[in-house]
Structure formats: structure tokens, C-alpha cells
Amino acid sequence: MIVTTMVMVPGYNEPPEHFNLLRHGTPQVPGLESYGIDCITFGEFNDTLSERIDRFAEFISELKDKGRRFPIVLLGYSLGGLVVRGFLRRYPARAKEISHTIMIATPTWGVQTYMLPYIHAMLRTPDKAFGDMDLSSDFMKWLNGTGGHWEFTRRGWYDWVLDSEPWIGPHGAKMLSIAGLIPSRGYDNDGLVWADSATLGSRIPAHFIAGPHANHMNIIGHFDPFIMASKGFLANDRVWPLTLRTVTRFLGAQPRPRVEREPKV
């Protein structure tokens, strides 16, 4: 079986081990590796997003030098999705090295960070990429090629609207955004990232996972006690297998044959 190389980029202030469920799966639900996907994780760093993108580009070059099979698949979770799309933005000539780009729960045009500084200070997280996620940050304007503004709607609330048509990705790039939608938030966000932000205002092809447990953490099977307590998320294993299935279908991956041995009596 041909082995596909996938590089996985973790989210904000998160270790790569948070991908373990998607990678390895469980005895009941085999993970990505059972589909012949060689999963390599990018490390946890505390630099800015711009610096991290350059570091990521060097990482990809090292994989090529080591003889890994190319083109490769990029998968980024949350802030990690900004890194993989940022790589395509900064290094367009290298787009041919990437077969598929997958972003999970990624705020492609940013998030509102007015409450996050207090959480950031309380947790004392060292990640310098915090400010880059803001809707109005210079990084977001660079990534999308445009900024945005708030517009009051007839529905009685404000919508974030881009000032002009954004940069989406390299021509012909195979991209997919996977996002959760929970009923307690009106089925339009995962508790942290809005559907419009995850899809760049419906411009990036998307797959939505909807349900009471399809929150920002469960979508990759990562359970953070603090986030669970502060956001009221419920934790279980119902959602990440749906994410796994979405990824493998997008890649056209087939599971390897499983050999089950007859138990000894």
C-alpha cells in the first residue's frame, strides 16, 4: 500500500500529543495510521505566527531532504490551521509539494480576543501567537489580503464582513475546512470559532459536524478540563470519529486490511 505522509500542526499552546486519538485511534475505531497515513507532528512553539510559518517551511524542507514521500498532506487544528494556510500564502511556489490542506476548527479570518487576554494572563500561556488570532490583527490582514469591519444586521446583531474579496489559497489547491456546530450556540459555531470564520465566509469548501457534543475540543478528541469548565462543553468520544471519517474520505484513503485472530479457548 502506498504510504501518504501527513504533517499535523497543533493549536494554540497545545502539544502535538493532542493528535494521538486521530493518529492511533482505539481498538474499536482505528486511527489515521490504519489507512496507510504516516502522521508526523510539528512541535509546540511559543513564537509568533509569522515566525512559526517560516519554522514550519524549514520543517517541510527537512522532511523532503530525509526522503519522505511528496506531495504531502497538511492538517492543522485551530491555530495550526492558520500555520498551514499561512505556509501556502508565504510560499506559493511550494504549493506543488502539498496534495491536500485540511483545517480543523480554524478561525481563518480570526476570532474576537476581547475576553481571551484575561484567560491568557490567568493561565500564563507563553505562546506569542495569541495576538495574531485577533480579527483586526496585521497577521489576519496579511493572510487574507484584506481586513474587515462590523455591520449591523436586520436580525439585531453585528456581522463581521470582509472589506474586499480575500485570498483563499493557491489556484487548484485542494482545501477543506472541518468545523463543529453546537445547538447551544445556535448551530453557527463550536463554542470558540464561528462557522463564517472557519470557512472564510463560505469561500473554503467545508464539512460541518453538528450536535451537542461537536465543540472545539471534542472535534479532535482533546479534553481540556479548564475549557470544559469555562465553556460548559460536554466531553465524550462521539465526535472525533466523524472528523476522522471526514479526513479519510477527503483524501480518498482506504483502511488497511485488519487481521483478527481467533481467541484461544
Stretches found by the model and what they are:
Residues 72-74, 87:
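A generic "structured core" feature
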Residues 7-10, 77-78, 105, 190:
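The conserved beta1-alpha1 loop
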Residues 89-265:
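Helical cap/lid subdomain of alpha/beta-hydrolase-fold lipid enzymes
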Residues 1-72:
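Active-site catalytic motif of lipid deacylating hydrolases and related acyltransferases
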Residues 18-20, 86, 113-115:
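Short, solvent-exposed loop/turn and secondary-structure capping segments
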Residues 76-80, 84:
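Gly/Ala-rich beta-loop-alpha elbow adjacent to hydrolase catalytic centers
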Residues 60, 87-88:
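A conserved amphipathic alpha-helix that caps or lines the catalytic cleft of carbohydrate-
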Residues 7, 38, 73, 100-102, ...:
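A structural signal for isolated positions on well-ordered beta-strands in alpha/beta enzyme cores
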